Amino acid sequence: MNRRHRIYEGKAKILYEGPEPGTYIQFFKDDATAFNAKKHEVIDGKGVLNNRISEHIFSHLGRLGIPTHFIKRINMREQLIKAVEIIPLEVVVRNVAAGSLSKRLGLEEGTVLSQSIIEFYYKNDSLDDPMVTEEHITAFGWAVPQEIEDIMQLSIRINDFLSGLFAAANIQLIDFKMEFGRLWEDEAMRIVLADEISPDSARLWDMQTREKMDKDRFRRNMGGLINAYQEVAKRLGIINENEPPRPSGPVLVK
């Protein structure tokens, strides 16, 4: 069996050299991490569900004309994606107070915000991903003003779509994290959505019960993470009500 060239390994995914120039294979791991990997556990089946959910969301966004790195899902754990130059920022869109926003500003968790808030965090685990301003971003050369504007506009469009998508599934989108990258095509460059959107990167609550259906179940030692992710997938129509879980999926050749 052929050994693949590993490009990068993060906390939840591995990037491998793709079959064609300008492509990667993105492999979804079962690792669950929190607090910049200070808390870590392997949860069988998490990567499979995140792959399916992220594929579903990115496919919808692509049909809406929102540029992404996604090409297609290859199998239960892998996607074929376009190679992009990742901008070292986490972009967080908040619709409801929760998590660090509640702690930072003393807001009761669950408080609906009068308008959606977009925040930027510098991707650096050793610094615990500090929040930064647009001035920091341009001063340190992480992105230029036009790129920031593109990211802001895309974030608003993505939030509008996802809020409706999840609401139709009786799920409230509390907040979510995104990453963006530069995609070079011939001499032209454009900003595209990268990474993933899944219950790992979004806070999702049941609209009636306010039950958490995301990685907070791991962060807060609530248990039931796989069941929650499966429920999200079922409500989005990704898996059938009676479809048995297939946790492990193919074994990756390293």
Swiss-Prot record:
It comes from the Bacteria. Pathway: Purine metabolism; IMP biosynthesis via de novo pathway; 5-amino-1-(5-phospho-D-ribosyl)imidazole-4-carboxamide from 5-amino-1-(5-phospho-D-ribosyl)imidazole-4-carboxylate: step 1/2. GO terms for biological process: 'de novo' IMP biosynthetic process; cobalamin biosynthetic process. Its EC number is 6.3.2.6. Keywords: ATP-binding, Ligase, Nucleotide-binding, Purine biosynthesis. It is an enzyme of class 6 (ligase). It catalyses: 5-amino-1-(5-phospho-D-ribosyl)imidazole-4-carboxylate + L-aspartate + ATP = (2S)-2-[5-amino-1-(5-phospho-beta-D-ribosyl)imidazole-4-carboxamido]succinate + ADP + phosphate + 2 H(+). One of its GO terms (cellular component) is cytosol. Belongs to the SAICAR synthetase family. This is Phosphoribosylaminoimidazole-succinocarboxamide synthase. It comes from Bartonella quintana (strain Toulouse) (Rochalimaea quintana).
